[in-house]
Amino acid sequence: MKKEDPIEESRRYVENARKTLRENAKLDPEENRYQDDKYVKAAGNYLWGGVLIALDAVFHVKEGRKRVDINCYRSVIKKRDRKLLGLVNDGYEYIHLYMGYDGSLSKNLCDNSFHIANEIIDKCAIMLGQKPELIA
């Protein structure tokens, strides 16, 4: 069986997150806020999962099925790419905490989270010798 390309898989997670927000979270255009935090949380978790797949492909931090602490990623990334470290720190805060745990209803925060996730995935794609999807 052919192994999935981790960058393609990461981007699939991003699209699933985008689809979840678009179809289920009920955007109020007047307030520029989503109405249902359940779907914002789900989208945040999909998005963070996609980021972790890309990071694992480059840095090989994950061992088996054991959960890896964010500090393990930080220590490995810090040695290789400080800009990526900043993005991962922002991603952890915006995507994992604000979206995934808190279910922040702000569309601006969610849009920024997608931008951060795509930047991280693109940097990982470059490190793997692949073409980035978007460079900001």
Residue ranges and their predicted role:
Residues 1-136:
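Terminal alpha-helical segments
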